Amino acid sequence: MALLKVKFDQKKRVKLAQGLWLMNWLSVLAGIVLFSLGLFLKIELRKRSDVMDNSESHFVPNSLIGVGVLSCVFNSLAGKICYDALDPAKYAKWKPWLKLYLAVCVFFNVILFLVALCCFLLRGSLESTLAYGLKNGMKYYRDTDTPGRCFMKKTIDMLQIEFKCCGNNGFRDWFEIQWISNRYLDFSSKEVKDRIKSNVDGRYLVDGVPFSCCNPSSPRPCIQYQLTNNSAHYSYDHQTEELNLWLRGCRAALLNYYSSLMNSMGVVTLLIWLFEVSITAGLRFLHTALESVSNPEDPECESEGWLLENSVSETWKAFLESFKKLGKSNQVEAEAADAGQAPEAG
C-alpha cells in the first residue's frame, strides 16, 4: 500500500508544480546563504590561522561551501523540471531521469544533514586545534627577529586585546615560557643570570605577562610583573585580590567565539535541510502524480501521487534485496573473470 497517497486533478498538479518552482528558487538563495556562511567562517579561521593547527579546522567551512554550491545547482535544475512539468511535451524529456534525480536529491539531503550535525559536534576537534596552535604561538612570541615568526608577537597581543583573554588556559601559562627575547636581556645583570640558572632549560622565566593581558577597566594601574610577589607592590595580595588582568584563557575565548558561530550556522543549515526535504517530497508527489495519469491525452483527468509506492518496511526490504542482488552479481562477475584467467594461465 502506497504511503501518503493523495489525489490530484489538473488544477492541483499545476499549483504543486508552480509552488515547487518558487520553493526551488528560494532554495537557490538558501544555497547562496550556505556558501556565504562557509566563506565567512573560512575567513574567520584564516584570520587566526597562526594560532591554530589547521589540519582539521577547515572541514566545516569547506563542507558548507560545497553543499551551498550543490544546493544552487540541484535546485536550479529542479526549478527547470517543475516549470517544464506544466507542458507534457517538455516534461517527456525529463521523465526517464526523474527517479535518478530524486535519488540524488535524497543523498544530498543526507549529506546536508550530516554537515549540519558537524557544525554542532566538532567543538572537541576545534578545542584541540586551538590548544596546540596557541601553545606554539606563545613559544614564538619572543622571536621578533626570526624570519617567519617576527609577526607572532603582534598576532598574540592583538588576539589577547580583542578577545579579552590571557595565555592559553590562563595568565599563568606565561610563567612557563620565556616570552622576552634575549636581545632585550642584560646578561651582565646578576638577576638575569640567576633566573637563567634557576631552571634546567636555561630560559629566562618570570612571573609576569605581556602588556596585552592587562584589563583597562581595572581602577589600579596594571601590574604585569612580579605577580606572585606581594611585597613588590603596595597593598597587594595575589591570592585574594582580583588581579587587573584578563583571567580567561584565549583557548576558551576563541572556542566560545567559534562554537557560537558554528552553532548558529548549524541551526541555519538544519532549517535549510528541512526546506530541502519538503522540496524533495513535493517533487516525489509531482513525479508520481504525473506518472499515474491514466489518459495522457486528457489533461483534466485525476491521478494519484504518493511519497512511497509501498510501506516503509516493504520499501526497506526491497532496498536490501536489491542491494544483495547487486552484491551477488558483482561476485558472479568476479568469479567469471577468475575462471577466464585460469585457462590462460594453463
UniProtKB/Swiss-Prot annotation:
The keyword Glycoprotein applies. Belongs to the PRPH2/ROM1 family. Glycans are attached at residue 229. This is Peripherin-2. It is a multi-pass membrane protein. Homodimer; disulfide-linked. Forms a homotetramer. Forms a heterotetramer with ROM1. Homotetramer and heterotetramer core complexes go on to form higher order complexes by formation of intermolecular disulfide bonds. Interacts with MREG. Interacts with STX3. Interacts with SNAP25. The lineage of its organism: Eukaryota, Metazoa, Chordata, Craniata, Vertebrata. It comes from Rattus norvegicus. GO terms for biological process: cell adhesion; detection of light stimulus involved in visual perception; photoreceptor cell outer segment organization; protein heterooligomerization; protein homooligomerization; protein localization to plasma membrane; protein maturation; response to low light intensity stimulus. InterPro entries: Peripherin/rom-1, Peripherin/rom-1_CS, Peripherin_LEL, Tetraspanin/Peripherin, Tetraspanin_EC2_sf. Retina (photoreceptor). In rim region of ROS (rod outer segment) disks. GO terms for molecular function: protein homodimerization activity. Residues 1-24, 81-99, 291-346 are cytoplasmic.
